[in-house]
Amino acid sequence: MYDVKSRVATEFIDDKEILDTIAYAKQNKSNRELIEQLINRAKDCKGLTHREAAVLLECDQADLNQQMFHLAKQIKQKLYGNRIVMFAPLYLSNYCVNGCTYCPYHYKNKTICRKKLTQEEIRREVIALQDMGHKRLALEAGEDPVNNPLEYILESIETIYSIQHKNGAIRRVNVNIAATTVENYKKLKDAGIGTYILFQETYHKENYEKLHPTGPKHNYAYHTEAMDRAMEAGIDDVGIGVLFGLNMYRYDFVGLLMHAEHLEAAMGVGPHTISVPRIRPADDIDAQEFKDAISDEIFEKIVAVLRIAVPYTGMIISTRESQKTRERVLNLGVSQLSGGSRTSVGGYAEEEPEEENSAQFDLNDTRTLDQIVNWLLDGGFIPSFCTACYREGRTGDRFMQLVKSGQIANCCQPNALMTLKEYLEDYASDDTRRKGERAILEELKHIGSDKVRQITINRLELMKEGKRDFRF
């Protein structure tokens, strides 16, 4: 029985409700009156239910689909402006005890080079990341209680925050590790993490168990209920996602929205971020073996309808996707982007030899961070390295209230410009610096408050003298 407020996985992600929703959406895929009503109602940026969003995803009317794409861009612009938050993943270890059939970290894989970074190696990686210009990291590690115990993750977080090389600093560490206990989530909270990220992979219980045949991750309920435990432990910001291509995309799309609705109903606040990765080739993984892979067209529509349905959330796309695809979805609602990424264990301080391949998946976008910043500026976006909300306590419900009211721009816009200025002063190529300076001058005109604009201008001048780390 479907119950959005239940803390039981199979009740807030109810199979019958998902199947009924998909059937309802298919019945109404040509219902212009209903679809137009939903599009018009979504313009107030209050979102849509999973059932309503499923109808938009299924819509077979070309002109209405174009209206959806336009609306998704409008909503993102209204709530998050033209800012794109930059981050990089840092893989600490690929030791793993799970048997996930789509991931090369699975314990049966004897061809992958197993690695685990020491604290000194982490130090070198962080210096390399700081020297690129990054301020925000997403930590990744396989699930292995012997090689990657929580104590190792906590020590690594402490090491990362302690390093300040030249003008560099990692100011927000997000963590993507396996589902764990309330007690362990409290320890992560105390370590000062930003967002706790955990992908569901697929919400289809039977397929989930087949894809995860062995190891602790096999437990569907424990995995699916992880965000409840994390939020119970005091972690304000959580990030959810599915790996599109593992299962029927309609099913996982609906499940993803039901999960977001559950978190808001049961825990008081929805997901801080939603990620939309697609399965990619990797060491001993052939992506073509997965028959539910989705086309670029479907992928783009998923991104657009997610933005319409969950307008408040940050939407993340990684270097799994090509430059062309990333460019398309940036105009459909994506608000966070990785750049200059390595998916191997380490790989920033020194390029990994080909024979030591330890990567979780192959990259599709191999450009440097500077090339991506330059490209974003060309597209009219403002690359943002801001971490101020986390550091100022604007997390959880406080953050969501600011986003939903449209007031987040009062902080985000000047903070984005100041962190971009830091990047331009310390790390950018000459061409990127010229483009960035022009963009900052133009964007200053759009700061609504005269007082905030003048403070921002004054701080930008101080940055020319070497001052750093200003924020609203």
Give residue spans per PLM region.
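Canonical Radical SAM [4Fe-4S] cluster-binding loop centered on the CxxxCxxC motif
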Residues: 80-81, 85-121
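Generic structural signal for well-ordered alpha-helices
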Residues: 88, 126, 154-161, 185, ...
